[in-house]
Amino acid sequence: MNSVPSKLEKNNIDELYRKNQVKSVSFLVILGGVLLLTVLLSLRAGSYETPIGELIKGIFGMSDDRKINIVVQNNRLPRIVTAILAGGGLGLAGCILQAVLRNPLASSSTLGVSQGATFGAAFAIVVLGLGATDGLGIPMCAFLGSIAVALVILGLSKFRQVSPEGIVLAGVAISSMFTGATTLIQYFADEVQLSTLVFWTFGDLGSTGWEDLGGMAVIVAILCTYCFAHRWDYNALLSGEETAISLGINVKRLTLVGMVLCCLCSSVVVSNVGLISFIGLVAPHIVRMVVGNNHVYLIPGSILGGATLLLLGDLFARTVISPVILPIGAITSFLGGPLFLYLLFKGGKKQ
């Protein structure tokens, strides 16, 4: 029997691919539009109510009201940029962790990577006595904490052949260990250190200024560039490690570099805004439901989705009981937890 596809079958495949391509691109455009709309809504949110036209002028310092320029440039705009960088970075990190571990439940929060980074930051503040003026001390300790967790997860996945569900359970155990260790450090902290540590556990997008965003922007840009350059490698990895190797892909290097960059991104986010949970899990899954597993669209979609979700969460936190601003970490955990349970039980039901 002839196994070569007929011309009609090829045409059907091409047509199906084109339709999926149009759907994916359209979804990314819509997602970008939603992000832009959320940015405009976030600009308006606050006790100082201003017409949107004046706010847009304030971005460039062109408003006739000097107070508007100050509020927009020094308060609202840095908060929005922080949410976009942190949310986009966490969304992409979750997408890549799910690809290299071939685990749909993987993310920096469910695997304990973010909790390891939080412990590293707490250790730097209380035990080493470092502060915000000590340069890269706190981010470096946060990175070491996250990379320690990543090495454990990588070892369990590659060398012990633990199942995807087992990896998630190991991540829960590791998260509990590092959360307990962070709590012990808090117990021995003085009042100033304790108030700083509360920031890490609650999450706060409003404490960063323009001078703090440069490092996070560079790390997120490096992660985005590397991952998009290897988008076809991640697609090949979906077919299995053996298939990827047969196509000439260095799977070990792809996995290791991807995990290191994801840990670096998670640690720099934790260092700047504290512990933000579930964005890296939720964003890739929402995008995947529309565009599928093609990383050509999944990678930019996860970036846009993560940025939009975190910005929406921050908008909710700032407006639900205004003028009180709720901690963004609590909001993302409250909204992301039920989805995590849904994905977990859905996966178990299929098996």
Language-model-derived ranges and their functions:
Residues 1-351:
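Alpha-helical transmembrane segments in inner-membrane proteins
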